[in-house]
Amino acid sequence: MSGGAASAGFTVLIPARLASTRLPDKPLADIGGIPMVVRVAQQAARSRAARVVVAADHPRILEACAAHGVQAVATRADHPSGSDRLAEACVQLGLADDDVVVNVQGDEPLIAPALIDAVAALLPARPEADMGTAAHAIHAREDFANPNVVKVVLDARGLAHYFSRAPIPHARGHADTAWWQGGQAGVPAGCAPLRHIGIYSYRAAFVRAFAALPPAPTEALEALEQLRALWHGHRIAVHVADAAPGPGVDTPEDLERVRSLLG
């Protein structure tokens, strides 16, 4: 069976937390008359997922999902991270250890169904990997230098070697990003800068195991939860997408941009 076929029964989980510092009630932000988290679920439903479930921390999110026919489960409001919320949802849904789960962020209303499918397919195709995620080529030096743009370096097997907010890989003898002029020309094989895309796949057993792992020093330093997996010796397979995904929503300005794109 091919990796794509083997991933057809996966579950998409969308963690949704009502509180947001920069955009109050973000999951419920109106986009063309539809709450944002519902938009995300509708996009995910166009993938090959067997089911799409919102893991919500507030009754208002549950009510919004119910009003639009989206399955949702209530999770505790005091989870320290989205991964902890997913672990609780996996237990509530009774997922088997080997069931594939794709974590789609609740602020990605333009997430491409094909990207979800590709990340889900990583685990059946790469049984040595505990997680899957995605990245795309960086083409602008300002993105390479931006600490809000997370970079990932891969090894020869296409597994994540490290994630960082710093501009990696770094060329010795050059200041910051001066070695790289954008694009692929003149870049040694395997060294082209890649931007990490915040979507993950796991087997349900690993979701629960990950939530129980102690945080890693690098995770705290960089504020990147995925570094916990690497620190503890787990492998993360990476799908390199052909293009950047649609914009996510972190701020009111982001919301207006997405509203304009969706008409």
Curated annotation (Swiss-Prot):
Source taxon at top rank: Bacteria
InterPro entries associated with the record: Cytidylyl_trans (IPR003329), KdsB (IPR004528), Nucleotide-diphossugar_trans (IPR029044)
Record flagged with keyword Membrane: no
SUPFAM superfamilies cross-referenced by the UniProt entry: Nucleotide-diphospho-sugar transferases
Pathway connected to this protein: Nucleotide-sugar biosynthesis; CMP-3-deoxy-D-manno-octulosonate biosynthesis; CMP-3-deoxy-D-manno-octulosonate from 3-deoxy-D-manno-octulosonate and CTP: step 1/1; Bacterial outer membrane biogenesis; lipopolysaccharide biosynthesis
Alphabetically ordered keywords of this record: Cytoplasm, Lipopolysaccharide biosynthesis, Nucleotidyltransferase, Transferase
GO cellular component: cytosol
Catalysed reaction, written as an equation: 3-deoxy-alpha-D-manno-oct-2-ulosonate + CTP = CMP-3-deoxy-beta-D-manno-octulosonate + diphosphate
GO terms for biological process, alphabetical: CMP-keto-3-deoxy-D-manno-octulosonic acid biosynthetic process; lipopolysaccharide biosynthetic process
Broadest EC class assigned to this enzyme: transferase
UniProt key word Translocase: no
Record's protein name: 3-deoxy-manno-octulosonate cytidylyltransferase
Species of origin: Paracidovorax citrulli (strain AAC00-1)
